[in-house]
Swiss-Prot record:
SUPFAM superfamilies: P-loop containing nucleoside triphosphate hydrolases. This is GTP-binding nuclear protein GSP2/CNR2. Belongs to the small GTPase superfamily. Ran family. InterPro entries: P-loop_NTPase, Ran_GTPase, Small_GTP-bd, Small_GTPase. One of its GO terms (cellular component) is nucleus. It comes from the Eukaryota. GTP binds at residues 21-28, 71, 125-128, 153-155. GO terms for biological process: nucleus organization; poly(A)+ mRNA export from nucleus; protein import into nucleus; ribosomal subunit export from nucleus.
Amino acid sequence: MSAPAQNNAEVPTFKLVLVGDGGTGKTTFVKRHLTGEFEKKYIATIGVEVHPLSFYTNFGEIKFDVWDTAGQEKFGGLRDGYYINAQCAIIMFDVTSRITYKNVPNWHRDLVRVCENIPIVLCGNKVDVKERKVKAKTITFHRKKNLQYYDISAKSNYNFEKPFLWLARKLAGNPQLEFVASPALAPPEVQVDEQLMHQYQQEMDQATALPLPDEDDADL
């Protein structure tokens, strides 16, 4: 990427790669941030769109250059050029599709092969859809690999900021960091059931307290 414009020189900027199976909602998710959508750039050589997502914290502005694959993952894995120099990542799956969760270890493997020790958030998208197939008790991969996990709903903006806040705190080495202003987000296309979201959060908290199952370890 070209050097940032002079007025952005002071803003800490981090390359964030967004990975996961096709159709899990990665592009929908990144497009929610309207400024990033307006300022995105296409890098033809590797077929990605880079969305600069700015967030304002109690310690100043922070920017994530979010690399979105433009659907290449449908044709197999991504090239190393996509991952090189990534400083953080979001792995996304669809809670209505078990196979997308089953493929998470493959995405994680490809990512850490190139990037090694970077902070990673695992996101289960589409929690607004009533027919949830991937339940809290089966979501254990993040615990085995020391990742953060959030339920999200890109279309409703539910938990949109959570992955970015967690990554910002890790990258800044500051757990006190907070977002002080919300970015302009696209209006929700769907509404989430607040009660159901609360129930999902409780189920996730309970599942996290349970010992890890060991039957999957050989695969992961």
